[in-house]
């Protein structure tokens, strides 16, 4: 089983698409009003780590992902848990500003590190704060120099300010650090901000055409270089298309990937902090392999591309911050992604038949913090 572990709600940034929205006058949907939030949830991990270890011992192969807030604000806890927990596989999702604080022996235990970057310096700093891009890139070079050999994923948040083609191309090839693993998530249907946005025009004129271009670029790289870039919104669905597999919610939330709150309660998703009516247990009394499932419901269950998309996002499915028509625009981006990948499928199969690439090139860590469907 996979578990996100919330260490702290504190963060050393106030990104425009995250904490800064707390200062905006946003609409509140009926679904959001129906959510019960546990206001007593501690700001930081407030239980004895030994309770966590006993819980994890009941899982023969747990994977633990450190999460926040910014988890590296509690580097002390990260180091302690990595050294003591009965876990072989660790991951972390971080803004990257404090990565240089981790000693080499701790770094070496992480199979995957997800670092938040949105594209070029100007875009990243506009979203996340002045100097963030340079500091993060410097820290990435530092941990590589210290011997870190695991997967580094550039995790982008995509908004109307993003030229998706330019941003992905930059992160894939630049003089600072070039990522072979990239994921992006669209900032859409997560808050009641649609009336403040120009989402429709951006999706139609920039994002959807850009995805078609990027899929072509992705397959071009396979043909010329004989390797498959780990661009996760393409990688995971294409692997399923090759094997003709259907998919549940691709991030695994609510059935394979759970979140441990700062008080030890267990929820289905790291975004659903404090949503107590969706808790499925507590680390002091639950078995990690016997947790209830929290599933996608409503309009997604009857969707024609459900087995491709999986439902996109459990939190959005429950809270529905955007209206029906607006949610349809988000679904349109997924349909565009699906059409682009299906159009590229014959070419990918030809490259496999010719021996340029092999099916195993699409293998990857499941539930690694990439939602897959943007």
Where are these regions (language model features)?
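Canonical Radical SAM [4Fe-4S] cluster-binding loop centered on the CxxxCxxC motif
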Residues: 1-47
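Cysteine-centered iron-sulfur cluster-binding motifs in ferredoxin-type domains/subunits
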Residues: 6-14, 70, 254, 300, ...
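Short, small-residue-rich loop/turn micro-motifs
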Residues: 9, 22, 117-119, 186-190, ...
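Radical SAM enzyme [4Fe-4S]-AdoMet core and its adjacent flexible, acidic
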Residues: 27, 130-137, 141, 145-253, ...
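A short acidic, glycine-rich active-site loop
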Residues: 38-43, 125, 288-290
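Radical SAM/AdoMet-radical enzyme domain recognition
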Residues: 49-65, 74-189
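Flexible mid-to-C-terminal extensions adjoining Fe-S/redox cofactors in radical SAM and related proteins
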Residues: 271-374
């Amino acid at each position: 089983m996979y578990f996100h572990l919330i260490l702290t709600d504190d963060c050393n940034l106030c990104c425009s698409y995250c904490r800064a929205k707390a200062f905006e006058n946003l609409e509140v949907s009926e679904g959001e009003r129906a959510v019960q939030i546990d206001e007593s949830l501690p700001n930081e991990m407030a239980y004895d780590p030994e309770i966590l270890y006993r819980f994890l011992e009941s899982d023969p192969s747990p994977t633990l992902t450190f999460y926040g807030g910014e988890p590296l604000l509690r580097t002390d806890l990260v180091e302690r848990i990595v050294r003591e927990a009965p876990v072989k596989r660790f991951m972390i999702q971080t803004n990257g500003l404090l990565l240089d604080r981790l000693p080499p022996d701790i770094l070496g235990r992480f199979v995957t590190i997800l670092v938040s970057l949105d594209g070029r310096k100007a875009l990243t700093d506009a979203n996340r704060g002045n100097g963030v891009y340079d500091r993060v890139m410097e820290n990435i070079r530092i941990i590589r120099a210290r011997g870190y050999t695991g997967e580094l994923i550039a995790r982008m948040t995509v908004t109307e300010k993003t030229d998706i083609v330019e941003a992905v191309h930059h992160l894939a090839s630049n003089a600072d650090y070039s990522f072979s693993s990239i994921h992006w998530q669209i900032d859409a249907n997560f808050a009641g901000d649609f009336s403040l946005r120009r989402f429709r025009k951006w999706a139609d004129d920039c994002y959807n055409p850009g995805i078609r271009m990027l899929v072509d670029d992705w397959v071009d790289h396979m043909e010329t270089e004989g390797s498959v870039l780990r661009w996760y919104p393409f990688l995971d669905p294409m692997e399923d298309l090759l094997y003709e597999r259907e998919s549940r919610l691709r991030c695994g939330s609510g059935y394979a990937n759970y979140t441990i709150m700062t008080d030890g309660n267990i929820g289905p998703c790291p975004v659903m902090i404090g949503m107590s009516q969706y808790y499925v247990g507590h680390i002091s009394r639950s078995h990690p392999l016997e947790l209830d499932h929290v599933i996608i419901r409503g309009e997604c269950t009857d969707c024609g591309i459900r087995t491709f998309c999986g439902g996109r996002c459990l939190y959005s499915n429950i809270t529905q911050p955007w209206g029906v028509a607006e949610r349809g625009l988000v679904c349109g981006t997924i349909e565009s992604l699906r059409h682009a990948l299906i159009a590229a499928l014959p070419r990918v199969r030809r490259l496999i038949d010719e021996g340029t690439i092999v099916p195993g090139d699409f293998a990857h860590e499941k539930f690694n913090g990439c939602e897959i469907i943007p």
